Amino acid sequence: MSESELPDDNQLTLEQALINLQCEDLGLRIYAAWWLGRFRVKDPRAIALLINALDDEADRTDAGGYPLRRNAARALGKLGDRSAVSALIRSLDCKDFYVREAAAQSLEMLGDIACVPKLLEMLNTPITSEISSLESDQPFDAILEALGTLGAVETIPQILPFLEHPIPRVKYAAARAMYQLSSDPKTAAHYGDILIKALSNNDLQLRRTVLSDLGAIGYLGAAEAISNTMAENSLKLISLKGVLEKQIPLATPPDLTAGAVRVMALMDDLL
């Protein structure tokens, strides 16, 4: 069950969510795990129960998936407690692709480099030539994004081959990571420009993904391209906000960099 499939309400209470997370009703347990993450409930009891839920065996689909584990893994990243790191690293071995994906994303959010060796091990999964099989191997895009955010420069040799990956979103995740890991501005700009070119892709969902990537890395050179992308203004504004946030620390308040002024003007035009 994804966030888009769940009601966006705050009718549950912390105490009831904790009870529901331990009850026999699997639907209530899944919802409670989602709710705790959605509303950033950073209660130690909640975190402990969510960590326990990563080992749940009761909620399993006919296809072998673990919906409760998925929601628990996603929630733990949002709660920001690094006590979950070890359990999330173990979850990277789960047979459920989406649990592994959620665990990688949450480890990226938690920012603990202890997960880098395991992520690198997953990245070394042999790549086959069939796209259909690649979809079921590893969540390569989530792994690459995590390595970039975590600053794992030692993984650059393993990331580089993914720039030629047959799945576009994986290829662009590699470019995003290389931008973050490149110390030379010209080299970083090269990878940022790969993402700019991707904004003209015919696939709307892919354009949305790349907008998110550019916002995450805050590439100033992409500002105009982001503004002109054929996508929802709301997503372009979020992406430009990411670019702006990278510019703000570069000036002494109340002054702004020329880049920040430029981005703010583009944002105004989208409002």
Tell me what each language-model feature is.
Residues 7-22, 41-59, 81-93, 112-130, ...:
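Amphipathic alpha-helical scaffolding segments comprising HEAT/armadillo-like alpha-solenoid repeats
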